[in-house]
Amino acid sequence: MESTAYDAFQEGCRLLANASPHAAVVALERARDLEPDKGSIRETLGRAYFRTGRFAAASSEFSRAVEIDPVNDYALFGLGLSLLRVGDRSGARRPLKLAVAMRPEMDAYRDALSDAE
């Protein structure tokens, strides 16, 4: 039986929730290849890459998620964190400032922005 993007996405989410980010990457890459313009898939794949230490790949996926959905505060946050991890503090500031502006109550967003400044 051929896997649909939704099935692969659900599998990836389950694996990520069960602390199996490497396995989640495989499922989520399959979902992304089937539905490359789904922001939720791109964001979740970014989270999986981040949790496996693949920060450049994570920033690429979070960036694409933001292109698809510019008001996705979590994708902006993930993009900023990923850029911080690859040493791009100046590049991290803009997405983190936007994430904080959208969700000022999120301590993690404000903390990450402080780290970037």
Regions found by a protein language model. Give the residues of each.
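Structural signature of tandem alpha-helical TPR/SEL1-like repeats
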Residues: A17-R30, T52-R64, V86-L98
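TPR/TPR-like (Sel1-like) alpha-helical repeat modules
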Residues: L81-A108, S114
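TPR-adjacent "capping" and linker segments in tetratricopeptide-repeat scaffold/adaptor proteins
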Residues: M1-D7
